[in-house]
Amino acid sequence: MKTSLTLGGLLLGGTAIFLGQFQATAVPGGGDGGTASVGPDVIVGAIPDVARYAPGTYQGVEYASYAFGSTSCNIGTAQLQWQPNPSNLHPTIPQNLYRIKSGVIEQIGMSWCKHGFCALQQTLCGACTPAGSGCPTVLGIGCSDPYTASLNGAQSDLKGRGPINPSTGIFSGTYTDPAAPAGLPTSLRERVMVKRSDLDPAQNAGATYVSECAYIHQQDASGNNATNNASYRLVTVGATWSTTQGYPLTLTGPTVQQLPAIFAWQASAPNDVGVKSYDVIGDGRFLLGYRVIDNGNGTWSYEYAIQNLNSDRAGGSFSVPVPAGVTVTNIGFKSPAYMNGEGYSNAAWTATQADGLITWTCEPNTNANANALRWSTLYNFRFTADVPPQTNLGVVNMGLWKAPTATSTATSVQMGARIPSVPTPPNTPGDFDGNGVVDGADLATLLNGWGAAAGDLNGDATTNGADLAILLNNWG
């Protein structure tokens, strides 16, 4: 058994893992389509259980604290190293929580990274060729390894995300974590820390919650198998707040393997939400989700969510084209908060409207702690416009935050999304054929309707000299 588990924790966790193994389903789209990858390929096969911890108050806000279990599977053709610290030949495992509310997904919590230390050789994802007996420091081909929620929430094995390069999986096995900020309760630190108000059923009627785990591993990355490493599972929130454990969370439905949480947004409204992945050469993957909501009052809400799956270069700007004549209001931005002493800023990106674009911009990379769109996070960009979206997808642009390198030279990523349409010009009285010009063709239409209602412009139900005067006044 894993030495970090007590016997009681192992028995309870084993029951949860057993149940969770039958709550996993493979879904194509970012995965391997059911075929084995060449080389080692680690995925999240199941999110089997959840642990909750004592809530607390930080900077005047009440928070709950959670951890999610994760069962890894090696679906590749080679073994995966699972060496404990100080070696860096093991996976790191971030955990996240999202909320889908009023048709929009937002990230509301994130943990530090659990560091793997050994791997059981189980069979969640199929036939297993064990790498050894017990809990060896290698995960065999086809084998699975369960980490319970209590294990993933153990602060002794949680370390900051910052020193990890998610696109290569490389980090120092001896890196030092930042000091805890003053006043942050110990029970909250390093775990999935969530505002009570973001979970309160009275304030979140109809909301859906989404848990997510991912595995980052340098062997997986070097084998080009790193784009299927996140999986999600839906969560429900109980009605009663506990002063010792916060709100109860219950995992529901299957674990959706090899798809990050942004796909839960699409699954919640498949006819309205689009999601597409974009790979940065020499770096990692971003996913853009978009939705346009008709407000029923002559305005439309444009919602964009970008999830950084495993890009080290991060996102630093986002631009959406807006045609001339469109009235834009309610420009907004949302990002999850860093609160564990990482030093990262939580400042909102600056929004500007100029040169036919709405652009949100992060501080430049001269500030190493700027609020860039870092890996395993999801940021939101939104506005309201007085025109519907154009029929075809338009081009939006995400700028990369870190400078180009010799192997990753791009400075931005073009993406497809729904964008505002060109406003319909107002109808000019006398322009019968709607071509935007009052000309001879329109005059002929009016004259052909003389004495009848066909050429009427002033609403008196007959075509006469008054209508002709209106047409001639708008000539050209």
Regions found by a protein language model. Name each.
Residues 1-32:
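Sec-dependent, cleavable N-terminal signal peptides
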Residues 30-31, 35-238:
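Solvent-exposed N-terminal domain segments of exported/luminal and surface proteins
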Residues 32, 219-274, 410-423:
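Short beta-strand elements
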Residues 183-203, 361-394, 400-405:
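Low-complexity, intrinsically disordered segments enriched in Ser/Thr together with acidic residues
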Residues 214-216, 384, 401, 474:
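Beta-strand-rich extracellular modules
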Residues 292-312:
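Short beta-strand elements of extracellular/lumenal beta-sandwich folds
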Residues 317-346:
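Solvent-exposed beta-hairpin/edge-strand motifs
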Residues 432-454, 460-476:
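Alpha-helical segments with a strong preference for the paired helices of cellulosomal dockerin domains
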